[in-house]
A protein has these predicted regions:
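Substrate-recognition element of Asp-dependent hydrolases with the DxDx(T/V) motif
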Residues: 7-40, 47
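A short, structured active-site edge motif that brings together acidic residues
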Residues: 24-28, 40-69
Length: 108
């Protein structure tokens, strides 16, 4: 489990020194349009509730399987993702989400 307050602090610290902060998340596999709309709304509400102090440069909620590097503004940026395939295909540095706080703390 990630400490959302700590995550928010680290994201804001990095944004203050010039990092662009974004989210790219998949919808569920095979979801219908109306269901996907509800899931998108729920994911955005979750971000606002749990790390609402972060000002996102971009948020993309996309169909399952969409190559994440193809829908973001900075495909050579840093990705945290639990899917190994997404990490392998990413054009920049990619990490598992397990140590996100520690990795962010090490960034300047």
């Amino acid at each position: 489990l990630v400490d959302m307050r700590a995550l928010g602090r680290e994201l804001n610290r990095l944004a203050a020194v010039g990092y662009k902060i974004g989210v790219v998340s998949w919808l569920c596999k095979g979801g219908q349009a109306d269901y996907n709309e509800r899931v998108t709304k729920t994911k955005i509400e979750w971000l606002r509730k749990h790390i609402g102090a972060v000002e996102w440069n971009e948020i993309h909620i996309v169909e399952y399987g969409t190559p994440k590097q193809k829908v973001v503004d900075f495909p050579d940026g840093i990705l945290f993702d639990d899917e190994i395939g997404n990490r392998k295909n990413w054009l920049g540095n990619a990490f598992d989400v397990d140590n996100i706080i520690e990795i962010l703390k090490g960034m300047e």
